[in-house]
Amino acid sequence: AITLTRAFIVYVRPLLEYSTVVWSPSLVRDIDILEKVQRRFTKRLPGLQNLTYHQRLASLNLESLELRRLRSDLIFAYKLVFGLQNVNVSDFFEVRTNTRSRGHPYKLDLPTAKNRTRFNFFSYRVIRVWNALPTETVNFSSLGCFKKSLTSTYLVRFCKVYFK
């Protein structure tokens, strides 16, 4: 099972996660199609057939693809806000200048959407999550520390609180 899991992580998962910051599925059916690949893989491993999907992921030390997409969006947002990408931040969103609000001082403002399609864009997906992050998570001085703070248990708990 360990060899198959490594093969899945090396060969299959990069195909499922290719360009997720640029395009991330927003429709439930599209999310399910991508997640179904990982569900089927974990279901076929010996000894895991009778476990639930989340139990299989935990026993294999894997995360759902949805959580991995959220993490990659947050990491890219961190890179944009702190100037680690050679990209004009104002093309995506505006960093608020008002630092008197609750939470961290790097809050982002949503650009207005003229149609439903823009809600799938990176800037719309990430802003609500980014603005809700606690100060201690956003204020890390290095990207590595920020990445370490985004553990799967933290993201699961965070998503349950803010998005359910």
Regions found by a protein language model. Give the residues of each.
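Hydrophobic/basic alpha-helical segments
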Residues: 1-164
